[in-house]
């Protein structure tokens, strides 16, 4: 589960950068 957290943060970061 802890391995999934950085992936989610990276997705949110990429989404924020896209917008």
Swiss-Prot record:
GO cellular component term of the entry, any: extracellular region
Record carries keyword Iron: no
This protein's UniProt keywords: Amidation, Amphibian defense peptide, Antimicrobial, Secreted
Biological process per Gene Ontology, one example term: defense response
Subcellular location field: Secreted
Superkingdom, natural source: Eukaryota
Summary of the tissues where the protein is detected: Expressed by the skin glands.
Phenylalanine amide PTM positions: 19
Function: Has antimicrobial activity.
Family: Belongs to the frog skin active peptide (FSAP) family. Phylloseptin subfamily.
Protein name: Phylloseptin-8
Source organism per UniProt: Phyllomedusa tomopterna
Phylogenetic lineage: Eukaryota, Metazoa, Chordata, Craniata, Vertebrata
